[in-house]
Amino acid sequence: MQTDYAEVVRRTIRSVPDWPVPGVTFRDITPVLQDPRTFRALVDLFVYRYMRQRLDLVAGVDARGFILGSVLAYELNLGFVPVRKKGKLPYRTVAEEYSLEYGNATVEIHTDAVRTGQRVLLVDDLIATGGTMVAAIKLLQRLGANVVEAAAIIDLPYIGGSQHIAETGTPLYTVCQFSATD
């Protein structure tokens, strides 16, 4: 069943060549979200994977990680923690800077977002360089969380992000992968 669902999701993801810049193929999840049956299939893949695990929270990475992360938190009867871009949270925060191709970026979470020992599932839509996900893992761990697994819809392993996540010791689950030639 899960293999079929994963293939349905993969086939529904739109590939947009040369966006946002020439030479890049953007993997667009909006067709998955727009079709209720495919969106349900995607959510079910994650729910079936995590429904028997002892989890306390789902953390979602800004911004598309909020979409899937909040739905999973609801379906699994867990709380949700947003990992935001710098300057978007109103309360005291802890921050982690990470490198981009041409500069740096920062993500933040509230200082009271997790308690020591809480078991957290970290969710985003896509793994490319892995920088944002690794920064989110570090933030959660700094606050004492146990990041049980990082999860995403799409992995682009040829860019190397999944390897960077593996180097943190955090397991990674993705629904599908795309190669540079897909």
Curated annotation (Swiss-Prot):
Main location as per UniProt: cytoplasm
InterPro entries: Ade_phspho_trans (IPR005764), PRibTrfase_dom (IPR000836), PRTase-like (IPR029057), UPRTase/APRTase (IPR050054)
Compartment(s): Cytoplasm
GO BP annotation list: adenine salvage; AMP salvage; purine ribonucleoside salvage
One GO MF term: adenine phosphoribosyltransferase activity
Family annotation (Pfam families): Pribosyltran
Pathway given in the UniProt record: Purine metabolism; AMP biosynthesis via salvage pathway; AMP from adenine: step 1/1
Catalytic activity: AMP + diphosphate = 5-phospho-alpha-D-ribose 1-diphosphate + adenine
Keywords: Cytoplasm, Glycosyltransferase, Purine salvage, Transferase
One Gene Ontology term, aspect cellular component: cytoplasm
Domain of life assignment: Bacteria
Task performed by this protein: Catalyzes a salvage reaction resulting in the formation of AMP, that is energically less costly than de novo synthesis.
Protein name as it appears in the record: Adenine phosphoribosyltransferase
GN (gene name): apt
